[in-house]
Amino acid sequence: MMQRCWQISLPLARRRLIPSLTSKRTAATEAPLDELDAFEREYLKQRIQITPFQRLLLGAGSSLASLLDPHRHDMIACLGETTGENALWNILDTMQASEEGRRILVEKPRINTRTIDLKRLEAMPPDTFGATYAKFLKDNNVTPDTRMEVHFLDDPKLAYVMTRYRECHDLVHAVLNMPTNMLCEVTVKWVEALNTGLPMCYGGAVFGAVRLRPKQRREYLRRYLPWAIENSKQMKPLMPIYWERRWEQNVDELRNELGIKLLQ
């Protein structure tokens, strides 16, 4: 079963919603409370329910606000939730198709300083993924505690998938060896867009590139964008990866497993 996730004939971003997801949608949305896990029950308590028209308005408004100010992380988060439902169902389907992905969906791990022992990761051998991630956080002065909570998705299962995507963003940076400057953020957004199909990622990739300085834009077109596209052709889906169980794995072996070639 572990292999099924990697046998998808088309990249996730180009897959259509398959018919079997209709029943999954119904089951996930209408399940009795006693059949939901702790994350799902807690999400339903704080979920903000909106109508289709309100969703349209929020999507348009957050899109405009994100373009005007890319630092409005609340608007970027809102955009992701109001435009990404179909892509999230596809991601959920992909995760359910592999043993590792199913384990994530059952255990619903969270990534923050309360759940991860960063001191332990820092003490690991430097060639491990755990040490690579800890070094990324330190070098870029970032913390896993800054991710926005999900509010506007109807289905709690999709809410977890979106939560997982957000909390894994820095892990993707680390495994790609990409810092957090604007050029690399745009590049990572392209990788995420092509790997997940999330409209928000495409928007960040396309419109983020517009804000690059001339020198950055030349490097982006000459090296970074071609690298992101070429890597994405061979890269395995990242969302089914249980990163927290890979801390001790050699980071180069992990990259080879995922089909990632670093930018030279």
Swiss-Prot record:
Pathway given in the UniProt record: Cofactor biosynthesis; ubiquinone biosynthesis
Transit peptide: 1-26
Catalytic activity: a 4-hydroxy-3-methoxy-5-(all-trans-polyprenyl)benzoate + H(+) = a 2-methoxy-6-(all-trans-polyprenyl)phenol + CO2
Presence of keyword Zinc: yes
Stored HAMAP family: Coq4 (MF_03111)
Family: Belongs to the COQ4 family.
Protein name in UniProt: Ubiquinone biosynthesis protein COQ4 homolog, mitochondrial
Upper classification of the organism: Eukaryota, Metazoa, Ecdysozoa, Arthropoda, Hexapoda
